[in-house]
């Protein structure tokens, strides 16, 4: 208690930390922010391309996030299933409020990633610049072959270990904070329905999607 009082007097406040991998290369991040991304943005404008930011994530029934209210001195109790199950999704967002997503079974592989790329290609007639992380599946020969045969989508890669630079990461956080622990889930199907309902709600609200780009770490992409 005394330490907390001192911290308050010194101007410190309790805040949710931003996690940063020690493997991250700060020079690569600087290069991305000052050179690489501005070049992508200029090229997109020149070619009439839409820039999207993509990512994969898993939502687990036992994930614990967010807070709940209760009388002072009493810990809130949330009734949830003791079973463990999950739902995997891949999504993409842009700073105009567009949201694309797909639920998939099992781990991400080249076939699943290509299936999502096909969905993106069908969503518009023009060129798409998709910015993603350096997951090996994004660089497989199958993916490269598909991209060569379907030239309307180009992939660009974020600096390694830099999820905080990806606006789509804040969609992932939004889902996990507002699904697990806030809806009753007795099965994987319940979780899947909850995730789809939430994503469709966000898809219908472009202004909410745009807010992901307000975070200080991704404001450069707004």
Name each region found by the language model.
Residues 2, 47-49, 169-222:
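C-terminal anion-handling pockets and recognition modules
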Residues 26, 133-134, 156-179, 189-191:
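RNase H-like two-metal-ion nuclease catalytic core shared by retroviral integrases
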Residues 140-150:
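Short, aromatic/basic amphipathic alpha-helical patches
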Residues 31-118, 216-220:
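Extended, low-complexity cationic-aromatic segments
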Residues 3, 55-57, 91, 117, ...:
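Generic structural signal for small/hydrophobic residues in well-ordered secondary structure
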Residues 126-139, 166:
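Acidic/histidine-rich, metal-coordinating catalytic segments
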Residues 18, 75-81, 149-167, 183-184:
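RNase H-like polynucleotidyl transferase catalytic core
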């Amino acid at each position: 208690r005394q330490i907390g009082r001192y911290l308050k007097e010194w101007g410190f406040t309790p805040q949710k930390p931003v996690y940063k991998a020690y493997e991250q290369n700060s020079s690569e991040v600087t290069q991305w922010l000052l050179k690489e991304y501005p070049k992508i943005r200029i090229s997109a404008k020149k070619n009439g391309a839409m820039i999207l930011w993509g990512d994969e994530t898993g939502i687990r029934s036992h994930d614990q996030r967010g807070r709940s209210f209760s009388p002072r001195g009493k810990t809130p109790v949330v009734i949830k299933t003791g079973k463990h199950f999950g739902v995997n999704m891949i999504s993409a967002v842009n700073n105009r409020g567009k949201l694309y997503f797909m639920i998939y079974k099992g781990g991400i592989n080249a076939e699943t990633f290509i299936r999502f790329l096909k969905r993106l290609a069908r969503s518009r007639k023009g060129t798409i610049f998709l910015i993603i992380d350096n997951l090996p599946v994004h660089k497989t020969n199958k993916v490269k072959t598909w991209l060569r045969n379907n030239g309307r989508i180009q992939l660009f890669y974020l600096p390694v270990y830099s999820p905080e630079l990806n606006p789509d990461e804040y969609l992932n956080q939004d889902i996990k904070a507002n699904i697990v622990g806030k809806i009753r889930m007795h099965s994987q199907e319940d979780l899947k329905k909850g995730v789809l309902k939430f994503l469709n709600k966000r898809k219908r609200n472009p202004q909410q999607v745009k807010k992901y780009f307000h975070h200080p770490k991704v404001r450069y992409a707004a």
